UniProtKB/Swiss-Prot annotation:
ATP binds at residues 179, 201-210, 323. Belongs to the RNA cytidine acetyltransferase family. TmcA subfamily. GO terms for biological process: rRNA acetylation involved in maturation of SSU-rRNA; tRNA acetylation; tRNA wobble cytosine modification. This is tRNA(Met) cytidine acetyltransferase TmcA. It holds the Pfam family NAT10_TcmA_helicase. Catalyzes the formation of N(4)-acetylcytidine (ac(4)C) at the wobble position of tRNA(Met), by using acetyl-CoA as an acetyl donor and ATP (or GTP). It catalyses: cytidine(34) in elongator tRNA(Met) + acetyl-CoA + ATP + H2O = N(4)-acetylcytidine(34) in elongator tRNA(Met) + ADP + phosphate + CoA + H(+). Its EC number is 2.3.1.193. Keywords: Acyltransferase, ATP-binding, Cytoplasm, Nucleotide-binding, RNA-binding, Transferase, tRNA processing, tRNA-binding. One of its GO terms (molecular function) is 18S rRNA cytidine N-acetyltransferase activity.
């Protein structure tokens, strides 16, 4: 049985191609066939599995990112219990020409109805779910590809012959014709920003390393992580200094870097755009490389959004693969399965522009992706063009995660707008109170839980809501009100479904806040920490649909207005123009403040959520409360407070903050403190100056 597979490998190596072999059956049978092939074919045989056989070179799929920059001959991916699609894409990208990738799956007909353990990572469900839509999509792609080999248990192996191909010339380390052409342009650059995009395996990082070795002056390198720049550094040797992006910006702000000729930014689309913009200002020349598509997301959104803000930039691209032949069968089937192809990423020719009022806004559910694969390609492709963080994990959510809702803007067959919403809420009051107190954070419910955990609105998770996860409009149709029309359609549908509100979470900018305001949303929260992905503070907004949703929205917005004076001092962004603030700022301690303070002192609410109430508390007590005053009023770094007070780590500092908050409350009104603490208290002992210590316990 194994001889045809073994016999085909020399021809595959000669042609520079790789192929996919699917072993479908009972897990023991599939693994045994893989072991037999491993014994007959020499190679590295990297095995990705949670339960690999003894004696194999194995790694868990969850650790697949450690493989970036490696190359292997042959691999096995065990998907008998669950399919980590990003890990599959990663291992496929590490395989050299001449490799077989063995994919172990359940029995073919049963596979779509089998619960997938990998769904625990992305479905926000407590138990594995059936992912029939995505698995059937995979099966269609596998069966449609003539170079994919499907070997089912109790059925004979039929190995399709490899078509005639020219012999493949393995790269010898010198630049390809495409690389040489681009390298010559870069070597002649006096100044400017160059953006190099390519699919994986095209040699863009190698080209960046070649620039370092050929350039006579100094070049610095940065990227989302040192592992991501491994190929570049291998090519450049010791000539390029690597910096973490935030450390590089800090250095540039304090030192003269005018003697550095080039800044090379590998996988630039994975770095927050505000950080990128700040870095580019310090260097006369910059080369930014990014992947057009892949398991980390698509760089097309990066091109459309970030590069459009640059004054002087030049787009470069590499199309020819280096590590395998053109039209490689494994790359082709992986691209089809994960909708990676460029022509699928929203680049369909658009029909003649009709009046905006004639654009259709249909609503979709997941069964529509199953019944209309082309619609799925166009909808997902548009999301991929607009959002760098759109990954295969999003494709799995979109197709199978519970509680997903979609709408599109369509002109004939073209999808020019896409909107994706997620169900949230419906938690019990007891669980919602635990979320507010910081004791529980169940899966999902991003905005609903955040309003409880950070904005004091404990009831938010008990209401029914839908969160806007993604919204996109193709570039040629923007500024036409299409996004607002899609949101209005979903607003009407959600109201019919008895939802209390729509919500959205976004990286705060004045432009985005204005957009959501025009869509009818009201700003209810701005966080105190910047998002790693956007470099912006997290903002949340609500659009109420019911009296309960209206009451929540008013309470949350009023809380934001009341707290803004203190929050703005912490984050330093301008006040949103539509946030009408009280004058002068509120300093009285209200019942809401007492509840918030009790949640911090006697439960597990984070200091960031309780910061405004704590600031008001400090104005009402003359107690020293040195740990709180140093941090909140004097802005002393936490490490300095820990050293000054002789504490052992941050955990001890947080415990002291909570103790001081309790002491301050007790000094002002001990009875009110006790009443406020009862609903959420953990076991606590409060030192009362001049009185016995007070123990509060709900055990």
């Amino acid at each position: 049985m194994t001889n045809p597979i073994v016999a085909s490998q020399p021809q595959m190596a000669q042609q520079g191609i790789r192929r996919l072999l699917i072993l479908s059956g009972q897990a023991d049978w599939s693994r045994q066939q893989a072991i037999m092939l491993r014994q007959h074919l020499a190679g590295d045989w990297l095995w990705l599995s949670e339960q690999p056989p003894e004696g194999v070179n194995s790694i868990s799929p969850t650790a697949a990112r450690t493989l970036l920059g490696q190359e292997n001959l042959h691999g096995v991916f065990d998907a008998t219990d669950g399919l980590n699609i990003e890990a599959l894409a990663i291992v496929a990208g590490t395989l050299r020409a001449g490799s077989w990738l063995l994919l172990l799956v359940p029995e073919w007909d049963d596979w779509p109805q089998r619960p997938d353990k990998d769904s625990l990572r992305w479905s926000e469900q407590p138990a594995p779910i059936v992912t029939a839509n995505f698995i059937r999509h995979l099966q269609r792609q596998f069966l449609a590809d003539p170079d994919v080999v499907l070997w089912q248990q109790d059925r004979p192996l039929i190995l399709p012959a490899v078509g005639s191909r020219p012999c493949w010339q393995q790269p010898d380390g010198s630049p390809t014709a495409q690389q040489q052409h681009i390298l010559q342009r870069l070597m002649q650059a006096d100044s400017g920003i160059w953006v190099l995009t390519a699919a994986r395996g095209r040699g863009k990082s190698t080209l960046a390393g070649m620039l370092v070795t050929h350039w006579q002056g100094a070049c610095w390198v940065t990227g989302p992580g040192k592992a991501a720049t491994q190929v570049l550094n291998q090519q450049a040797g010791e000539r390029a200094r690597f910096w973490a992006p935030d450390a590089l910006l800090d250095y540039c702000q304090r030192h003269d870097v005018s003697d550095i000729d080039w800044l090379l930014i590998d996988e630039a689309a994975a770095i927050p755009t505000p950080l990128l913009s700040a870095l580019l200002a310090y260097f006369p020349r910059a080369l930014l490389t990014t992947t057009v598509q892949g398991y980390e997301g698509t760089g097309r959104g990066f091109l459309l959004k970030f590069c459009a803000t640059l004054g002087d930039w030049h787009h470069l691209t590499l199309t020819d693969p280096i590590r395998w032949a053109t039209d490689d069968p494994l790359e082709r089937v992986m691209d089809n399965a994960m909708l990676f192809h460029d022509e699928l990423l929203g680049n369909h020719p658009l029909p003649k522009r009709p009046p905006v009022a004639q654009i259709e806004i249909p609503l979709y559910e997941q069964r529509d992706w199953r019944d209309n694969p082309e619609l799925l390609r166009r909808f997902y492709g548009l999301l991929s063009t607009a959002h760098y963080r759109t990954t295969p994990l999003d494709l799995r959510r979109l197709m199978d995660a519970p509680g997903m809702h979609f709408s599109a803007a369509r002109v004939a067959d073209a999808v020019i707008g896409a909107l994706w919403l997620v169900d949230e809420g419906g938690l019990s009051e007891a669980l919602a109170l635990d979320v507010w107190a910081g004791r529980r954070r169940p899966r999902g419910n991003l905005v609903a839980q955040s309003l409880a955990a950070h904005s004091g609105q404990w009831q938010a998770p008990t209401l029914l809501s839908r969160r806007i996860s993604r919204v996109a409009v193709t570039a040629a149709w923007r500024q036409q009100g299409i996004a607002r029309r899609m949101i209005a359609a979903e607003q009407a549908h959600a109201r019919q479904q008895q939802c209390d509100f729509l919500s959205v979470s976004f990286g705060y900018t004045a432009e985005l806040a204005h957009f959501w305001h025009r869509c009818g949303f009201r700003l209810v929260r701005i966080g105190s920490h910047k998002e790693a992905s956007s470099g912006c503070y997290t903002a949340m907004a609500l659009l109420p649909l019911s009296p309960a949703g209206e009451a929540l929205c008013q309470a949350a917005q009023q809380q934001l207005k009341r707290d803004w004076y203190w929050l703005q001092q912490w984050i330093g962004i301008p006040t949103p123009v539509f946030l009408r603030l009280p004058e002068p700022p509120e300093v009285t301690l209200t019942d809401d403040d007492w509840r918030e303070l009790a949640g911090f002192a006697f439960a597990f609410r984070p200091l960031e959520a309780s910061l405004p109430a704590l600031q008001r508390l400090l104005l009402h007590t003359e107690l020293p409360l040195s740990a709180l005053r140093h941090y909140l009023q004097l802005r002393t770094p936490q490490s300095e407070i820990i050293n000054t007070l002789g504490l052992i780590g941050r955990k001890a500092l947080v415990a002291l903050w909570r103790q001081e908050a309790a002491e301050g409350m007790a000094m002002i009104d001990v009875d009110k403190m006790i009443m406020s603490a009862k609903p959420s208290a953990r076991c606590s002992t409060v030192r009362l100056p001049g009185r016995k210590n007070l123990t509060i316990c709900q055990c």
